Amino acid sequence: MVRARIIGTGSYTPRKILSNNDLARLVDTSDEWIMTRTGIKERHVAGDGEATSTFAYQAALKALEMAGITAGDLDMIIVGTVTPDMLTPSVACLLQHKLKAYQAAAFDISAGCTGFLYALSIADSFIRAGNCSKVLVVGAESLSKITDYTDRTTCILFGDGAGAVVLSREQGQQGILSTLLYADGSCSNLLYMPGGGSAHPASLETIAKRYHYLKMDGNKVFKTAVKALEDCVVKILEKNKITGDQIALLISHQANLRIIQAIAKRLELPKEKVFVNIQKYGNTSSASVPIALDEANRQNRIKKNDLLLMNAFGAGFTWGSALVRW
């Protein structure tokens, strides 16, 4: 059977670190308050001259190196992001140029924190259809650029970085077994950034109203995310006739430690089967899952033929899951 197999992973986070204590000097918060409610200790943020394509490029280089191929071997580049360098052209096109992968098609996916899984599912479809042999899938963000550091409810959450995988068209049982994707646009006003698009283009008024920063109803997002992700992971296991105890590692979107724990509890997974790095990076949106995947891979937390379950939830609302045999 033809499958899209992950043959390389890579990740990159900027050097600059913003700790909880740093944030406590900006807004009314504390290390204890943030850790208790989110599990986040620190996050990496972009430095001068760094943008989303900067991080995507570094993560891509590492993934290509592990895969043992060159950028010239790629048929397609897909980037999941909500923080592109600019509205157009896409981060994927900028990345294509940096990599000199001029033979590859390139485009972005905007699906909130689920962007990487949406991109992974699209790449899987292209490979299964026989239209691509090698695809680079990247999740990359510069959320610090759209974070309001006067808003204590959101500034504690977000960080920057990128993760990448190389998918290869191969025969066998290893690779992406299944993906499930969902969306509910009726909840778009619960997590959004109103400024900068065609509805509210940049102006003195939109800047004064702070429209160019993320807005979020944290409580409603949390409650919806827990239920949606619990249902999603159960459905993908049922679809593939797999039980929770067969999962070797759960890699959830690193948005909130309590959400990750709720999903693990639903699947009755012990701690050693749940990958967590939120304490180091915070919520990196589309970059979250591929960064965690790369770290788990390089820490030898995943072995050949292991079943890996990934899931994410984000603005839109969007959510989804992917089941992979390593």
Name each region found by the language model.
Residues 6-8, 34, 63, 74-77, ...:
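Buried hydrophobic positions in well-ordered alpha/beta secondary-structure cores of metabolic enzymes
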Residues 35-37, 41-54, 81-135, 265-293:
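Conserved catalytic cysteine-centered active-site region
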